[in-house]
Amino acid sequence: MPDQIETYVETAMDQVRWKKARPGLAAEIRTHLLDQRDACLAQGMDEGAAQGEAVRQMGDPVALGTDLDRVHRPRPQGSLLVFALALAALGTMVRLFLTMDTPSEIPGLTHIIGGVLGAVCLAAGYRLDVSALGRVAGWLCLGFLIVITPMLPIWVFSWQESEVPAIYLLLILFPLTLALLLWRLRGRGWPGLLGALAWALLCGVLCLLIPRLLAFSQVILSTLVLGLFFTCRDWFGVGKRLGTVLVAAFALAFAVLLPVGTNYLGSLRNNVFPMLYPSDIDNYIPYISANISTIRAALSGAKWLGPVDPSLLVTEDGFPRVPNMDSDNLLTNLICSWGWLPFLAVVGAFAALFLWMLWKTIRLRQTQGRAVCLGGLTALGVQAVFSLLLNLGVPLFAASFPLVVGNTGTVLNMFFIGLMLSAFRDGAMPEERPAERLLTVPAVSWVDGVLTVNFKGRTLSE
């Protein structure tokens, strides 16, 4: 590296206090100086004079570094961190108090442990470097697949419990893997885009094998949102219009498989489960259809404050209760036990957190961080919408409300929110350029009477 240019870069970087930002900024300055030097060389200057002129045109390195230090600084997300912790603590207390004096299948200590683990995972996600995760996106996808695949045959032997971890992993963490993979494969043309879509297709097939259509819907929506985010910026180099059409067509074709998945689940329910669990099949018939009339009747008698009339509830073991009161229908239990106002307060707090993170995501300039945040918002939004529909008596899929319902879901959602806050904190990091596309070069070519033999196979595009 030329001495004058390297000295200039080092002097400028000495003024930047954020060590994580230095490599990217140094690369940008170095590239600009080299371009200026090459322009000077083309004008007939010697090497030393060209370097000196390039450095002179860039100005004072101390002033440049000071200006960069003013712009590129970490932005701690203390307020969002406290808000997310408070909402998770509220969700833990709701789960604990609503099931404390009831015949719940989930012990109260489990809710406390889930809340503590969620706080730990939030802190862990916040401490992680999202840009470092992007560099190992392929390995993360492989590890994700290794964890998910062994869970597929387990549900055959214990379908009521063992599917839950796989469902939550696909529902919440799939958008993260897709966002990181899309960022990692950017700039690689059709192989990169098709590779990311192949990953989405594989995860969609896994959703049907578990089976759970909510996770399948998450795969479709995440692929559409994140795919369009990258193709509209032509980060794969295939053309904005063509890439956008391909992603939209892929998501549409994927959505057509929803009826196929529904028929597949119906076949399992009617043919397989009765043979495996003849005594429990009545309990398995989906509560979405079996208990919906009870839920609607209970909601019709709900008050703004105070419990509902016990005669509107189901009596089990001499205790009036809401169907699935300690799991997916916890919000219905909240309405019937405390009233509409506490329900609106809980949902409003989550909506405030969601909109706050959405606003920060829109303002975020860094592509990788923005993609991760879009994936997280998609995961949270899908869970929230379908859970609200279920708890208000309009069921489509069984879903748990983020940070309020479900211990496993709370832990994974808190981890993802921590990653989003990490992306907000590092939003001032310099943007990394897409990888250069590899162009196929003929092994033997004849141009203008010159025979060329290529032994490397591929070269980097300029």
Where are the regions that the model predicts?
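Transmembrane alpha-helical segments and their membrane-water interfaces
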Residues: 108-133, 171-188, 222-237, 355
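Cytosolic juxtamembrane regions of integral membrane proteins
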Residues: 45-102
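N-terminal, intrinsically disordered, low-complexity segments
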Residues: 1-46
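A juxtamembrane structural motif centered on a specific transmembrane helix
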Residues: 194-195, 199, 387-394, 398-462
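Hydrophobic alpha-helical transmembrane segments
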Residues: 113-121, 335-358
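Hydrophobic, glycine- and aromatic-enriched re-entrant/interface helices and adjoining loop segments
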Residues: 240-343
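Loop-to-helix entry and N-terminal half of a specific, functionally important transmembrane alpha helix
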Residues: 360-398
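Hydrophobic alpha-helical segments of polytopic membrane proteins
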Residues: 195-205, 214-260
